[in-house]
């Protein structure tokens, strides 16, 4: 009965979404306040109904209701409770239900906290959100229904993919979806602005918090996925340039560009058309990523589903929303003329360059991701585009961004003087040169890569600190009184610098050793003595494992005792490799036990990875900085609304 209630709630949610999509839009066009007022209760009701449906599906997983097809295919009575819950979204149907839940949640948040918005703008934004909700609810109900019953309930289920039974991956999809779907708010604001023919400083102030929130969630989601790949898959890498990974990177880059261009609209009322285009394309690339992950048109090491019928449906959604928005953009963008003028050397120009670099970087990732599909369609050639292409094509744009970032942050609006600009950055430049000298003395492996990474990372980090010092008027007592947005910007930029340094130094200095070892054998890797003490059978809650005990020593002193595993999940008869890592500030010692070899030995892989944890520490700092900025009172206030002189004005400029 609970499952049927959830299914019925999902159908009702579709009906409410239809009302939300049509009635407020007509009301805004006609100026009927009563019709526009329907948007808020409809958005709240839609969220409540989808939450009921999601709760019903969660209940079915927790209680192991194997009469439900989805539970049978993705759960088992022996599975730990955490993975019973995360199994709700560890599959295509459940993940799409989570998608529409988050979509409705953002719409409900806009309805609940959007009281400062002009009445017509709020109605149109919520109507666009409702239209997106209609499309995805139809997709869920007709192609991906999570509430289908089996004629006879089996005694037990088939279990979830063992690779997904991990705490890191349990929370990776929700954060990623919060980012993907969060960009729908920027899209809805962009389409509403195009309908009204109005983009001004107030609009930019309204759209920035939603974009920033989506960017924060994407940052956390990408970091969690990368961290999971690093420690769970056993290959020692953190980014594979796989289509599924690229699907999240592209909207992240465009969301970052949108954040910076919206600042120019807010402060100088320039880049209006470009900002609208970025808002459309950021969500458009979220839909493109969804299509790539779920259609099966491109081979991926971890695609979610390979169903051409679903892929065609998602392609239709992509074409309808992105194509429709771009058509509207082509018709109305010319009305949004820029007001603010600026010189070639100014903060506006630096932000334009920032946008160009980020947008072209996203285009490079997109080209490399879809090129195998293009080659097969037009030339009937099967090929793959791997890490070498992306590293060579993507890296130059990131290097340019790193060099520009501290300079642009210090520039004043409208016009800047190079002489006045360089002076506050001299301490940052001196400290960067000191870091370069230190790395030059200590670097091994690929010293030029290490120098470049350390130099760029230090330049960004020290540049962020120099900006904080400059904004405080070079007075220590004023530093802590700076607005949270200033501190958030410094943390986010500094975190990016740490990521730059971590990625480059890891790639320059990592050491890999692959060998066969027997119990009692010791061997040397990068100054560490590794001893394989034993390999034993250890039972788990829903798996059996060959667990190795391995000691790591340095200079005769025991540093760590690690226990890498080779697991077998009997329900799916699937082996997995569980690495064990001695995490450190300066390096990771990463051990993997492989298959047994002839003569009683075991395949053993050892990696020593310098500065690996700096990558995820930098990502967390970026997300923290974004969150700190989001708590700034200037984001929470309705100042933008107060600056809108006529709430119902349709055309301006």
Curated annotation (Swiss-Prot):
It is found in: Cell inner membrane. It is a multi-pass membrane protein. One of its GO terms (molecular function) is heme binding. The keyword Transcription does not apply. Keywords: Cell inner membrane, Cell membrane, Cytochrome c-type biogenesis, Membrane, Transmembrane, Transmembrane helix. NCBIfam families: nrfE (TIGR00353), PRK10369.1 (NF007691). Required for the biogenesis of c-type cytochromes. Possible subunit of a heme lyase. PANTHER family: CYTOCHROME C ASSEMBLY PROTEIN-RELATED (PTHR43653), CYTOCHROME C-TYPE BIOGENESIS PROTEIN CCMF (PTHR43653:SF1). This is Cytochrome c-type biogenesis protein ccl1. It comes from Rhodobacter capsulatus (strain ATCC BAA-309 / NBRC 16581 / SB1003). The gene is ccl1.
